[in-house]
Amino acid sequence: MKVRPSVKPICEKCKVIKRHGHVMVICENPKHKQKQG
């Protein structure tokens, strides 16, 4: 999980979602997981 000021999809399987007011990227590849904060 990477915590970044700006989250962007890295590959085609990355999905940008909003959870509890946080923008997150979820993906099949665990290295692509990101969270804004």
Swiss-Prot record:
GO terms for molecular function: structural constituent of ribosome. One of its GO terms (cellular component) is ribonucleoprotein complex. InterPro entries: Ribosomal_bL36, Ribosomal_bL36_sp. GO terms for biological process: translation. Keywords: Ribonucleoprotein, Ribosomal protein. Pfam families: Ribosomal_L36. Belongs to the bacterial ribosomal protein bL36 family. This is Large ribosomal subunit protein bL36. It comes from Symbiobacterium thermophilum (strain DSM 24528 / JCM 14929 / IAM 14863 / T). The gene is rpmJ.
